[in-house]
Swiss-Prot record:
PANTHER family named among the record's database cross-references: URACIL-DNA GLYCOSYLASE
HAMAP family in UniProt: UDG
Known catalytic reactions: Hydrolyzes single-stranded DNA or mismatched double-stranded DNA and polynucleotides, releasing free uracil
Name of the protein this chain belongs to: Uracil-DNA glycosylase
Cleaved signal peptide residues: none
Localization annotation: Cytoplasm
One GO molecular-function entry: uracil DNA N-glycosylase activity
NCBIfam families: PRK05254.1-1, PRK05254.1-2, PRK05254.1-4, PRK05254.1-5, ung
Any one cellular-component term (Gene Ontology): cytoplasm
Amino acid sequence: MEHSSWHALIKAQLPEGYFGKINQFMEQVYSQGIIYPPKEKVFQALLTTLLEEVKVVILGQDPYHGPGQAQGLSFSVPDSIPAPPSLQNILKELSDDIGVKKSHDLTSWAEQGVLLLNACLTVPAGQANGHAGQIWEPFTDAVIQVVNHLDRPVVFVLWGAYARKKKALVTNPHHLIIESAHPSPLSVYRGFWGSKPFSKANAFLKETGQEPIDWLR
């Protein structure tokens, strides 16, 4: 992370010494038990999608908490792992909106400029939201603020009540916010189905002179 295009701008948004606190937190929790994703993948979203490449932000809450699932990108799992229910629903909506994506590893999206950011970057095994409110939210809020300050128009995709609260951080009128219910089985019928976020994002990118995302890659 220190050498990425994000580092200095995120640091400028945070209180003095906050990166040190994050390092201390990670040393502590990874030494005490099983934490996901693997330590080397905690910042994977920022390492895969450089600041100068961001076109779309898809905000998740926290990583998957089962073995082998979390890979540092919101909603994504390796193809060797069955797609969790929320991801199944995302891919079904994509299929209805644009077409079928055969892989449920979303790394190809990240490589095209889709920042797959969780608000909380770590989770204890088997404990959803187990690290919520401890260290990560100021950091990931800073990431959102850095993107908000870009002159280049960006699409923010906010699914569910938690992500939609982050709308307050997106104040730049150049950007587009696409919001709906969360793709989880509990809320998918409350407005996620039929929301067409993928075609809407691409229409906006084309309107603003940017290359659309190949969501099926």
